[in-house]
Amino acid sequence: MYKLHVRGFSMEDTSCPRKERGTFRAITDKIPYLKKLGITTIELMPAYEFEEQVIPKKTVLPDYLKWESHGEDLIKPESVQPVEKINYWGYVPGNYFAPKASYSSSADAASEFRELVHTLHENGMECVMEFYFAPGMNQNVILDALRFWVREYHVD
């Protein structure tokens, strides 16, 4: 079993065309290499649609809302700027019924993902996926999402 992150697997791979780096297509193109290594199962870290930008729960008001100058001796206090964080890994709730669009080299992420799974199966390999479901999430939604990926994309 080989666990991989779709974007991280090929983002720096110069043998892939630049447009395909970090995409489902790049993994599809690397299947012969993975098969040669003896890998029989690919485990994808979250590849469903999720929010990549972490939105801070506590926001800092912009200067024009919180600071007024009443004289020349006033020194403007330093404002704390929130650091933008990127959720690279995807272990957050998301849209469990869609492949991650930014992991596709084309406008049709669903077809590209379907092609990846189909090509893996043609080469005698399995494709399993990881999902993050928040504690307390409705179990019917979880089961519906898992069934969807099996029926729609034939993941194992």
Please provide the spans of the model-predicted regions.
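Glycine-rich phosphate/pyrophosphate-binding loop
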Residues: 1-11
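Catalytic domains of carbohydrate-active enzymes, especially glycoside hydrolases
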Residues: 29-48, 83-84
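Conserved, mostly hydrophobic/aromatic
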Residues: 4, 34, 44, 96, ...
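Flexible loop residues that form catalytic
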Residues: 9, 47-49, 101
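Hydrophobic faces of well-ordered beta-strands that scaffold small-molecule active sites
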Residues: 2, 42-44, 127-129
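Aromatic- and acidic-residue-enriched carbohydrate-binding clefts of CAZyme catalytic domains
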Residues: 16-23, 54-122, 135-155
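Residue-level detector of anion-binding/catalytic polar loops
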Residues: 40, 126, 154
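Short, solvent-exposed turn/loop segments enriched in Gly/Ser/Thr/Pro and often Arg
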Residues: 45-52, 131-136
